[in-house]
Design a protein with these regions (language model features):
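N-terminal intrinsically disordered/low-complexity leader segments
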Residues: 1-5, 78
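Hydrophobic alpha-helical connector segments
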Residues: 57, 71-105
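Alpha-helical DNA-contacting segments of helix-turn-helix folds
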Residues: 56-62, 126
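Helix-turn-helix
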Residues: 11, 15, 19-53, 57
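Short, basic, alpha-helical segments at the C-terminal edge of helix-turn-helix-like DNA-binding modules
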Residues: 30, 60-67, 71
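Amphipathic alpha-helical packing segments from all-alpha helical-bundle domains
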Residues: 91, 95-106, 120-145
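Short, hydrophobic secondary-structure boundary micro-motifs
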Residues: 112-115
């Protein structure tokens, strides 16, 4: 029995990333992704159940990093924070905004895939869902204050 070619994974993901960024999820074709990666569709289906699972693989790291970042910020015990620190948390400081921009830039392709290219996937409402999630976190934070 032959061993799976690990190089195929990287080629498939890179090809899928290019096609999804260029055409969006709905217009990207698995045949084109496979042709550009120089693999058969059978090789793709040995690794992924379909196009959406391939898309999931591309955005998984970005989603995980977003959740980790949110968890770190939301996990602060408000009873141990000074009034000055609480007031500062509401200020959109230059450093805070630049930190968020740097985060987005470091995960640029993942964000573009989620915000602009995800129609037809379970992430099709990512921007709305993300804003609603952040609003709920802020609301809970206010309730606890």
């Amino acid at each position: 029995m032959s061993l799976p070619d690990a190089a195929i994974d990287g080629r498939l993901l890179e090809s899928a990333r290019r096609h999804f960024l260029e055409k969006g999820f709905l217009n990207a074709q698995l045949k084109d992704i496979c042709d550009d990666a120089d693999v058969t569709t059978g090789a793709l289906y040995k690794r992924y159940r379909g196009k959406e699972e391939l898309f999931d693989a591309l955005v998984a790291d970005t989603l995980r990093e977003i959740e980790e970042s949110i968890s770190q910020r939301a996990g602060i015990d408000l009873h141990t924070v000074s009034d000055q620190a609480l007031a500062g948390a509401w200020a959109n400081t230059y450093d805070g905004v630049m930190e968020w921009f740097s985060f987005c830039n470091a995960h640029r392709d993942g964000f573009v895939l989620l915000v602009r290219c995800a129609a037809g996937t379970r992430y099709g409402n990512f921007l709305h869902d993300f804003c609603a999630h952040m609003t709920e976190i802020d609301y809970q934070w206010l309730v606890e204050m």
